[in-house]
Amino acid sequence: MIEIRDISTKYRETFVLRHVSTRLPSDRMVAFIGSNGAGKSTMLNIISRLLEPTEGSVSIDGRELRKWDSRELAKTLTILGQTLHTPARLTVEELVRFGRFPHSRGRLENQDFLQIEKALELTEIVDLRHCYLDELSGGQRQMAYIAMAIAQDTKYIFLDEPLNNLDMHRAARIMKLLRSLVREQGKTICIVIHDINFVSFYADYVVAFRDGVLCHQGPTEDIIRTDVLRDIYGMDIAIEPYGDKKICVYYAVSYTHLT
């Protein structure tokens, strides 16, 4: 379990997160939602130890994050950020191999190669394995980075807008894949995401931010409601049933407030 206790963070003199406390459920897909600049990515960077909070603390599996050994932490959590730098003349397979570094320290063994192959297959990029990253489309590169994160094979996977640059087919494929990692392998996945309908269909739990404050949290069905979404996004969103799920219709809306 991930426990967040009274986290506040500021850049220069401006607070971007204020007194955030919550517990993120294990073995679930947790979606961080909210408008641009609400604090979602900052929170993800803090719980992955990429950013030190101004105040407060984070614990993973009962141990304070700052007390984790770096190598042990890299075997426990994976973070795929929003800004990805493409190394010159690196192939897809070479990139995915980096996901095994916390385990192999550069000396790949049979288990490492099996995980690499599995990640390439799950993301459907086996045929791109020998292609150089700078030869790929943005969507293909994104799939390669997701494969690298999967190859790391950690208990916790943190993804910051992983659907960037993906077409509808690949975006849906990735969300189904992440869902299967939770269901079949007991992974805990925290994902920053803007597409509220993917949240509705695939997330188990939602944490919503507005102006740096945690404004709503709970099971997905408790968040996908007109009144709650209005408070989060400042716009009226129609909600329609689709089987046992809900679809949010927000293409023609009226605004109540902008955050």
Show which residues each predicted segment covers.
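The feature captures the beta-strand-to-loop junction immediately N-terminal to the Walker
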Residues: 33-35
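Conserved ABC ATPase "signature" region
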Residues: 97, 110-128, 153, 158
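Conserved ABC transporter NBD signature motif
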Residues: 56-64, 73
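Helix-to-loop junction immediately C-terminal to a conserved catalytic motif
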Residues: 48
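Conserved small/polar residues in nucleotide/adenosyl-binding loops
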Residues: 256-259
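Conserved ABC ATPase signature
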Residues: 132-136, 140
